């Protein structure tokens, strides 16, 4: 397990400084790698089950191999630096590139701000950037719901899971996870084109998020009093509704937060989680929940491994 100072500084750098420019962002580079091999292996939109399964698997293996090699070499180079201040700072800065704490808050808050200003059309356009559903027909309630769903799901994807894999496996663990997560975002959905080609990526993402998503849900339960939530309701939501989404993982944070803040989150035609009116105040408290759950994780990790 790596020193807690690396995780604390990495989250601090990401939360208060933000991500590097796209030209040098590792996750953007990973996305370009995925697209490159997709163009090599899947030059046509036609579907062939066996071919797509094989080439989708090869795409994942090749990209993960490249990411692991690069992250491992970077980690070795940093660890060879004798000056501890430079070594710790550089390691933490690189690690921060695997986290999306600041961007999660900013993207989730944007549609909420438009709702506050009674600009529903801009809110729908804003929330379209963070969810895959059609937002054209959404009302105020469902725009807020989509924003909160995205924030609660991405507590795992963007922050807790990268920190967990970094804690156990260092830079290679964090960036291998981010690579799998990027794969899932790009090709891991059940469209005709990616039904088989993206299957390996989707399964691997489900596996890697299984434990982190449940840890993230528990963090939301424990930290509930700090963001205006209710511990008992959060706990009931976690166990009663956590498995009610199509994803085997995302429901645990969404259901926990929905019940903790007494609000109904709904993706029309797919699921309803929690009960109660969604308000702007509850939406903003959801973003506080992100910060407090991450803070709690870092405190627990520091107590255990400092």
Swiss-Prot record:
Which GO molecular-function terms appear in the entry? ABC-type vitamin B12 transporter activity; threonine-phosphate decarboxylase activity
Q: What does this protein do?
A: Converts cobyric acid to cobinamide by the addition of aminopropanol on the F carboxylic group.
What does UniProt list as this organism's lineage?
Archaea, Methanobacteriati, Methanobacteriota, Methanomada group, Methanococci
- Bilayer topology annotation: Multi-pass membrane protein
Q: Which residues form a coiled coil?
A: none
Q: Which domain of life is it from?
A: Archaea
Which gene name belongs to this protein?
cobD
**Its GO biological process terms?**
cobalamin biosynthetic process
Task: Give the UniProt family note.
Answer: Belongs to the CobD/CbiB family.
What subcellular locations does the record give? Cell membrane
Q: Transmembrane segments in this chain: where?
A: 54-74, 88-108, 155-175, 207-227, 286-306
**Pfam families associated with the record:** CobD_Cbib
Protein name as catalogued: Probable cobalamin biosynthesis protein CobD
Q: Name one GO cellular component term.
A: plasma membrane
The alphabetized UniProt keywords are:
Cell membrane, Cobalamin biosynthesis, Membrane, Transmembrane, Transmembrane helix
Keyword Isomerase part of the UniProt annotation: no
| Species name | Methanococcus maripaludis (strain DSM 14266 / JCM 13030 / NBRC 101832 / S2 / LL)
The biological pathway it contributes to is: Cofactor biosynthesis; adenosylcobalamin biosynthesis
């Amino acid at each position: 397990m790596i020193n807690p100072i690396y995780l604390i500084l990495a989250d601090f750098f990401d939360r208060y400084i933000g991500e590097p420019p796209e030209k040098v962002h590792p996750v953007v580079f990973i996305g370009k790698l995925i697209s490159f091999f997709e163009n090599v292996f899947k030059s046509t939109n036609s579907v062939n089950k066996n071919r797509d399964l094989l080439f989708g698997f090869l795409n994942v293996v090749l990209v993960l191999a490249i990411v692991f090699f690069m992250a491992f070499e970077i980690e070795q180079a940093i660890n060879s630096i004798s000056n501890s201040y430079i070594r710790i700072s550089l390691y933490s800065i690189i690690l921060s590139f695997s986290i999306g704490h600041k961007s999660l808050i900013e993207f989730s808050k944007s549609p909420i701000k438009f709702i506050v200003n009674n600009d529903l059309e801009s809110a729908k356009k804003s929330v379209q950037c963070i969810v895959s559903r059609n937002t054209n027909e959404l009302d105020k309630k469902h725009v807020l719901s989509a924003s909160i769903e995205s924030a609660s799901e991405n507590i795992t994807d963007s922050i807790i899971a990268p920190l967990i894999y970094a804690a156990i496996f260092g830079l290679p663990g964090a960036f291998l996870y981010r690579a799998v997560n990027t794969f899932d975002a790009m090709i891991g959905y059940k469209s005709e084109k990616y039904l088989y080609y993206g299957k390996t990526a989707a399964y691997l993402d489900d596996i890697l998020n299984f434990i982190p998503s449940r840890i993230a849900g528990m963090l939301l339960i424990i930290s509930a009093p700090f963001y205006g939530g209710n511990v008992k309701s959060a706990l009931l939501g976690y166990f009663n509704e956590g498995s009610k989404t199509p994803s085997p993982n995302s429901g645990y944070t969404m259901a926990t937060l929905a019940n903790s803040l007494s609000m109904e989150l709904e993706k029309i035609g797919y699921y309803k989680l929690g009960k109660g009116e969604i308000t702007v105040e509850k939406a903003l408290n959801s973003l506080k929940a992100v910060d407090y759950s991450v803070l709690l994780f870092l405190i627990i990790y520091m107590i255990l491994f400092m």
